[in-house]
Amino acid sequence: MAASNPPKGSVSSSSIKPVTRKAVRCQREVAWLVTQAAGRLVASTEDVNAPTPSFVLAAALDFVRQLELAAQDASGHLDYQNVMAPDLQTFCHMAKLPAAPNALSDAGYMFTLSGADLIRDIYAYCSELAEHHVFDAAEVKPGYAIKLVLRLFLMDEHEAAQE
């Protein structure tokens, strides 16, 4: 008898596919921040197509990593606490954004990450934030990291850096 068929219920390495979509629970504020970041991306490129939320997040994460490297090179660091501390209205004023609708409050929003690389990058960023004790480990969840990345992207880079 040939043993070419694996037993039922077993998983072969060839049948495992990377996760390409992941829903992350966020505050409703994240949806608004994504629209503001998308507007900034469209304004800074010649592409008039609206970017997807995942594209916006990937661009913002790349920008934040560049900010972090520049801050390290200047023997400084990003002031994560200052970026996350204010409420949304105060943040909008700090980042020179239009005022956000009051209805956003803390209602939930499901952000769907698309792409295995982005999913992996967001979870790796959460691990880095926890490892460096930037925030309490309980706070460093994907939804919080997404909000942080979008806020850093929308702030003036000089305001986000701290010597």
List the predicted regions and their residue ranges.
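Short Lys/Arg-rich basic patches
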Residues: 2-42, 82-124
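Short, basic amphipathic alpha-helical segments that act as recognition/interaction helices
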Residues: 44-78, 129-163
